[in-house]
A protein has these predicted regions:
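ATP-dependent carboxylate-amine ligase
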Residues: 1-104
Length: 104
């Protein structure tokens, strides 16, 4: 099953195992927005951005994904923020749900 166009990545720990492949899956499925909430969310947002940029050797074009981090905010706040994203980053279809993916 493909991921929704907008995802909130809910971190329960600072563990990053599997993050690279998860973001690759998001890109494969056409995810347009990822909001990150939980421990280390600011650093994890940066990692997501670097993965989307891709390798510097030109073997892949950068992937256009909007990201945000929600330090000191609740999961519900991050979901509410994601629900209000519109335009190019609104997801596959207007009004599409926000999917919460838990890591850690």
């Amino acid at each position: 099953m493909a991921y929704a166009g907008k995802v909130v990545l809910h971190l329960r720990s600072t563990e990053r195992q599997g993050l690279d492949s998860l973001i690759e899956d998001f890109m494969r499925d056409g995810v347009r927005f990822v909001g990150v909430v939980g421990p280390d969310c600011v650093d994890i947002e940066d990692v997501v951005d670097w993965i989307c940029l891709g390798p510097c050797d030109g073997t892949r074009e950068p992937y256009d994904m909007l990201t945000s981090s929600h330090d000191d905010e609740s999961l519900e706040d991050a979901i509410s923020f994601a629900e209000r994203i519109t335009g190019n980053y609104q997801g596959h279809a207007f009004g599409e749900r926000v999917e919460v993916v838990t890591l850690g």
